[in-house]
Structures are given as structure tokens and as C-alpha cells.
């Protein structure tokens, strides 16, 4: 039961960090390459 409580307290923190990093990365890509329907590095 203690492991479940630890998991339930760690998972929201990790997912918040992950989505924050992902959102920041997408914002920076859109700032560097505005209106890119396909990315110029392909």
C-alpha cells in the first residue's frame, strides 16, 4: 500500500515536469520556425 501511495504522489509531479518541458520545446520550435507545416530539417 505504501508503494501505491508513493507512485500516486510521484506520477503527477513527473507528468507535470514532462508536459512542461514538452510545451516549452514546442514553443521554442514554433518561435524559431514560425508557421512551419513541415519542419525544415527534413
UniProtKB/Swiss-Prot annotation:
Q: Name one GO cellular component term.
A: chloroplast thylakoid membrane
Q: Which HAMAP family match?
A: PSI_PsaJ
The family classification in the record reads: Belongs to the PsaJ family.
Topology relative to the membrane: Single-pass membrane protein
Domain of life per record: Eukaryota
Q: Kindly state which keywords UniProt assigns to this record, in alphabetical order.
A: Chloroplast, Membrane, Photosynthesis, Photosystem I, Plastid, Thylakoid, Transmembrane, Transmembrane helix
Q: Does the keyword Nucleotidyltransferase apply?
A: no
Please name the GO terms of the biological process aspect recorded for this protein, alphabetically: photosynthesis
Instruction: Give the source species.
Output: Lemna minor
Q: Which PANTHER family match?
A: PHOTOSYSTEM I REACTION CENTER SUBUNIT IX, PTHR36082
Cited Gene3D superfamilies: Single helix bin
**Cellular compartments annotated:** Plastid, Chloroplast thylakoid membrane
Q: Does the keyword Plastid apply?
A: yes
Which residues are listed as membrane-spanning?
7-27
Q: What does this protein do?
A: May help in the organization of the PsaE and PsaF subunits.
Gene that encodes it: psaJ
Entry's InterPro entries? PSI_PsaJ, PSI_PsaJ_sf
Name of the protein described by the UniProt record: Photosystem I reaction center subunit IX
